[in-house]
Amino acid sequence: EGLIVIDKYTMILSANSSAWNLFHMDRVCQGESVYCLDREEEFRHAIEQVLSGEHTELVLKLNGSDIQLIANPVIRDKKTEGAVVLLVNVTEKLERESLRREFSANVSHELKTPLTSISGFAEIMQSGLVKCEDIPQFAGRIYKESQRLLQLVEDVIQISQLDEEKTPYTWEPVDVYQVCKNAFESLKEKAKRLNVHLYICGEYMKMEAVRTLLEEAVYNVCDNAIKYNRNDGSVSVFLTQTAQEIQIVVKDTGVGIPKEDQDRVFERFYRVDKSHSKEIGGTGLGLSIVKHAVGALKGSVILRSEEGNGTEICMKFPKVHKE
């Protein structure tokens, strides 16, 4: 937090180093007018307002950052003798609020689609317009949309918990090979249905991790690799280790990701092929969950892809957890 004390003539009487840093000043401006820090009209108006005896608050744009200014007049014998100006960098806070609003809007939109379908099918059935032989088909559609809805709710809960970072995590030795094997076991029916072959290459290895987070990360990467693959394609997991690090690489033979989309695939609800997103399924939160889970495990994730030639996602983790 930056702190500046000025007199009634706008001269700087005192300021801390944080204040100079927030204004990107390479010198101390004590004894000069506070206007030397920022000559924008908004800042000038705030200073004039506080020196007229009014409490003032606003957010300034300084060098690409959002800085909250809180100014209080110093009053003696009913006269304003100066002011105390507090400066707080709120860039991260405002970004989080913006992301939260965007997330809420996206969740509402994503929930509306399956709910509208379920409501529509149920209304047609209730009206008696459906032939008896068509009822299983309509019921199947309702079931499919309800499963999509459940998956979305589960993913939203998962990513909200990761965002809050309040969940007490239990770190323990985890068999990485077994985690990958379990993910393939859970996905084998989907892979079989889409005619995608699954392979694990590596050896038994352990790392200190939060088991549920590692399982979420591996499962979601493998799930995406299967969904966006081609007929008779494959998904291969390669496990390697060094003295300090575990590396999990998931490589597929799928459609690949265009270069212009590669920086955005870890964003919430971002889908590369929006026209086929409903057909392929999923909530658009899978890779966002991966990013959060890997980050919580103090790891890193790297994506390499070429449109038409598959995708490779590399997750690196430290073997030993350090507080």
Across the structure, where does each feature detected by a protein language model lie?
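Conserved glycine-rich
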Residues: K298-G299
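Short alpha-helical segment of the dimerization/phosphotransfer core of two-component systems
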Residues: K144-L149
